From Swiss-Prot:
TM regions (residue ranges): none
Lineage of source species: Bacteria, Pseudomonadati, Pseudomonadota, Gammaproteobacteria, Alteromonadales
Protein family membership: Belongs to the methyltransferase superfamily. RsmJ family.
Function: Specifically methylates the guanosine in position 1516 of 16S rRNA.
Keyword list, A-Z: Cytoplasm, Methyltransferase, rRNA processing, S-adenosyl-L-methionine, Transferase
A Pfam family: SAM_MT
Protein name: Ribosomal RNA small subunit methyltransferase J
GO cellular component, one term: cytoplasm
Claim: Glycosyltransferase is one of the keywords in the record: no
GO molecular function: rRNA (guanine-N2-)-methyltransferase activity
InterPro entries linked to this entry: 16SrRNA_methylTrfase_J (IPR007536), SAM-dependent_MTases_sf (IPR029063)
Signal peptide: none
Length: 272
């Protein structure tokens, strides 16, 4: 099959499959997200301009950096691994992120995660009962996240959580349908981290080479404040300045990060 013509900014990436059982699904994904369709991943060796490859492998979508194969592949997995461990043993409503968004007895906010990425924090909030709308502007990241959510819906342990997560592929907060009416807008813009775990270092390296620096992060705060009903929560490294240098209403400090909380109005107390 000849490759599907993709938009110019995606010319350095293609989508293929490892096992033929995934070939039809890989074709559908390439068409849905407008990626070049590669066919079998072995064909990448004949296309020297390719820098990245999305591959269907064991029924999951993965991202690889072709010139650094030792980095391995990135995929979204809400069923096993670190995300599953955090869901089971992460501390429930006592977690700092739950406090930051105002989650409490009788109030489970609708959270718009406007920098969804791989969806880890969104999944934590969804597992605590929040309704999540996820906004991701990069098609590669959105495709990975969408695949992870859809696979999670097929797993009986996390299907209810995944069904609480709605993904929007869009370029900006200004484009978000006002009918969504989030209680809280959550922001976690990319920021150069000093200390990284091996996994985070791998992901940051691949994503920064793929999407570049997050130069417009400061521009997120004002539209987020306009959209949120009660508050905006910004996750920052502990050493980073506040987003747009705007002092938050309060901060929740952790070991390496903090949550800056910008309160618009008090969350109403539940009626008892």
């Amino acid at each position: 099959m000849s490759p599907i013509i993709a938009s110019e900014h995606l010319s350095n990436i293609a989508l293929g499959y490892v096992d033929s059982v995934d070939s039809e699904y890989a074709k559908r994904l390439a068409k849905k997200w407008q990626f070049n369709y590669l066919g079998h991943v072995a064909a990448a060796s004949k296309q020297p301009k390719l820098e990245f490859m999305l591959q269907m492998h064991h029924h999951a979508l993965e991202l690889c950096k072709l010139d650094e194969p030792k980095l391995g592949a990135i995929k979204v997995d809400f069923v096993e691994g670190a995300v599953a461990h955090r869901r089971k043993f992460g501390g429930g409503r006592g977690q700092d992120i739950a406090k930051a968004v105002g989650l409490k007895h009788g109030f489970k906010p609708h959270v718009l995660d406007a920098t969804a990425g791989l969806g880890r924090d969104a999944f934590v909030l969804a597992s605590l009962g929040c309704k999540l709308t996820l906004l991701e502007r990069m098609p590669v990241v959105a495709a990975l996240l969408d695949d992870g959510i859809e696979r999670a819906k097929l797993n009986h342990e996390v299907a209810d959580i995944a069904n609480n997560m709605q993904l929007i592929h869009g370029s900006s907060l200004e484009e978000v349908d006002l009918a969504i009416e989030p209680d809280v807008v959550y922001l976690d813009p990319m920021y150069p981290h000093r200390e990284k775990s091996a996994a985070v270092k791998k992901e940051m390296r691949i994503f920064q080479s793929l999407v570049g620096e997050d130069l417009d992060a400061d521009d997120l705060l004002e539209p987020a404040l306009a959209l949120a009903k009660y508050r905006v929560v910004v996750k920052r490294p502990s050493y980073a300045p506040p987003l747009a240098n705007k002092k938050p209403s309060m901060s929740i400090n952790m070991k390496k990060n903090r949550f800056d909380v910008y309160v618009k109005q008090a969350i109403p107390k539940p009626i008892t």
